């Protein structure tokens, strides 16, 4: 399991909704990644739409997948 020190926090915009609560997110630096909602966002029933600004956490081991940890207002 990755520790907090092993994560990279970035911001991006939701580009596409994928099946299974996954999302295509375009990062600020122009790199597209696949992301899923973190557990607390699922429990709070927070939904994402195309165009939402989000904060994602990425593991240093796999830079193509991320976890959405915050949806900006």
From Swiss-Prot:
CDD domains given in the database record: S1_IF1
Keywords: Cytoplasm, Initiation factor, Protein biosynthesis, RNA-binding, rRNA-binding
GO cellular component, one term: cytosol
Domain of life of the native organism: Bacteria
Name of the coding gene: infA
GO MF, any single term: ribosome binding
Assembly, per entry: Component of the 30S ribosomal translation pre-initiation complex which assembles on the 30S ribosome in the order IF-2 and IF-3, IF-1 and N-formylmethionyl-tRNA(fMet); mRNA recruitment can occur at any time during PIC assembly.
PROSITE patterns listed in its UniProt record: S1_IF1_TYPE
Lineage summary: Bacteria, Pseudomonadati, Chlamydiota, Chlamydiia, Chlamydiales
Intracellular or extracellular location(s): Cytoplasm
Pfam families in alphabetical order: eIF-1a
SMART domains the UniProt entry points to: S1 (SM00316)
Record family assignment: Belongs to the IF-1 family.
Protein name: Translation initiation factor IF-1
Its job: One of the essential components for the initiation of protein synthesis. Stabilizes the binding of IF-2 and IF-3 on the 30S subunit to which N-formylmethionyl-tRNA(fMet) subsequently binds. Helps modulate mRNA selection, yielding the 30S pre-initiation complex (PIC). Upon addition of the 50S ribosomal subunit IF-1, IF-2 and IF-3 are released leaving the mature 70S translation initiation complex.
Residues covered by the S1-like domain: 1-73
């Amino acid at each position: 399991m990755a520790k907090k020190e092993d994560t990279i926090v970035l911001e991006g915009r939701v580009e596409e909704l994928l099946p299974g609560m996954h999302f295509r997110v375009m990062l600020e630096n122009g790199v597209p990644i696949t992301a899923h909602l973190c557990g607390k966002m699922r429990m709070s029933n927070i939904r994402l739409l195309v165009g939402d600004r989000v904060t994602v956490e990425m593991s240093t081991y796999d830079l193509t997948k991320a976890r959405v940890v915050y949806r900006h207002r």
